[in-house]
Amino acid sequence: KFSIAKNHLIPATLGEHGLDADSLVIDDDALRAVIDRYTREAGVRWLKKQLARIARYASEKIVSGTAARPYVVTAEMLDPILGREVVRQETARNVAVPGVVTGLAWTPVGGEILFIEGTSMPGKGNLTLTGQLGDVMKESATISMSLARSRLAYKANGFDFIASDVHIHVPSGATPKDGPSAGIALFAALASLITGITVDPKTAMTGEITLSGTVLPVGGIREKVLAAHRAGIRTVILPSENRRDLEDIPDEVRYEIHFIFVDTIDQVLFEALGVDLHETRAPIPVRNRVIPVENI
């Protein structure tokens, strides 16, 4: 969109409003801000309308003599010209909280980060899911819970699966969400909640999981990584089979993010939480009794 606007839309808009490059200059940061904060579409129709609003505003200033030529538009000037931003950009959080993980999603208008939040309470082992999740995403959460119960019993830090209910919420509840690509993020959120170990809020992840613990490739990697970069994410965990998709990501973005590739949820646990499932197992506390692993 940036290239299309720079090379085609802006010159056309200037001509339509009787302006030229010596009359109006929209700097690169302002153009990126218009794209990110004032448009949300797969095409460029709304972007063209916003550029036209800027051109009309500049024309009025120049004709009235209240602005010199060229009239330079910066990102800081967009609020009085276009009003409040219409797209709220999520940014990486600064505080790590057990049970909270950053995922990556693809939408028809580009990628975005999403937060997966988990909490627990006394109960009977039930799993509650909220945030307008579709059937496929609910299945991913169920798989994640089964994997957590089967893999993390001896790492549970006193967590009682039988006597606890777990609630997973994905904010922006008014927006429907679906698809399998949040699998590893859902699992990591549950693992963080159960172990009490936090995940770096500057780390984001995407990938489908199976009941055997395999991590499968997902789509929309370019859009997801670009969204992560915009949000201030420093590390992205991806399925190994998506490694080739990095070729589609601009160099300036690819070199500023640390990529980690995984094949299994065991690797996700190690990379995201520092939990090694292959180390020597300690006895498992089960309801007030300590039972050696080999006797379970």
Question: At which residue positions do the language-model features occur?
Answer:
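Residue-level signal for threonine
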Residues: 27, 74, 250
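Peripheral, non-AAA+ core regions of ATP-driven protein-machinery
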Residues: 70, 88-93, 97-102, 109-296
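Conserved C-terminal "switch" segment of AAA+ ATPases
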Residues: 2-52, 57-71, 151-163, 196-202, ...
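Conserved catalytic-core segments of large NTP-driven translation/proteostasis enzymes
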Residues: 30-120, 124-133
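Alpha-helical structural signal
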Residues: 5-6, 10, 31, 55, ...
